[in-house]
Amino acid sequence: MDKTTFSDAIEQVMLHNWFYAPLQLIYKEFEKYRDKTWLTPDKTIQERVQRDKRFTKIWYWVYALTEYLGKLPQEKAIKTEKDKNERIHSRMQWMLIEIWNMNWYSTYTPDKNWIFENKEIWRLTTIQEIPQFTYKNIIEDSIRFVDVIWFNERWFPAKLIEVENSTDFRAGFLKMNEIQDFRTDFLFIAPEERKTKFETEKNKSAFSNIKDRCKFLTYDFIEKYYENLKEWTKLKNNL
């Protein structure tokens, strides 16, 4: 008989993810440590992280081991304009990961160094390696560098997302052009004032095959979408 409790298994997931984890990752990794034998195991997991004092909620759907709160990574202070831009970029990446996690699908980011709200952003994703959905060289040379990728339930990329705070849009378009034959949408997230630059790049002949699938969204839109989705998810879970 398996003597590992639900809380023990949750604790193991967090210990192997540097002391914290989003709920979606806990669901995914849980069975490495205990079988999901109950009728509604995911609801039981939710109940345990909310009630067991071993765990502390540190963000929406993100929980940490209470005894290790002092060991969580710390954000560096903003001292330069570069630091400010990096903080904005990491905030957007974090929101984009959370949005797809709330939809219970898989998320990926290549960035291992950025921290937001004392959480390493990549540890909020549900996968660390891109599934081999196409030729290896396309993934290794281009796709793995995309800021955020949302995968569907079949492990194909549903959306490729680039956060363009100050960099040229062209690099993002070139990455996305590599998988033009897939049914994937391409999102560019940037300040409103950069939309003209986005449209200019999108309308170049080199990107004619993907231009209709490329969408520009502002930082304000992502923030509002995130907050509304968070509230809707709370209401849905109370039904």
Where do the language-model regions lie?
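Catalytic cores of nucleic-acid endonucleases
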Residues: 135-146, 152-220
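Nuclease catalytic cores
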Residues: 45, 73-110
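Cationic, amphipathic, low-complexity alpha-helical segments enriched
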Residues: 18, 38, 59-61, 94, ...
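Active-site metal-binding core of divalent-cation-utilizing nuclease and nuclease-like domains
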Residues: 80-85, 101, 109-155, 227-237
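Charged low-complexity interaction tracts in eukaryotic proteins
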Residues: 1-6, 31-79
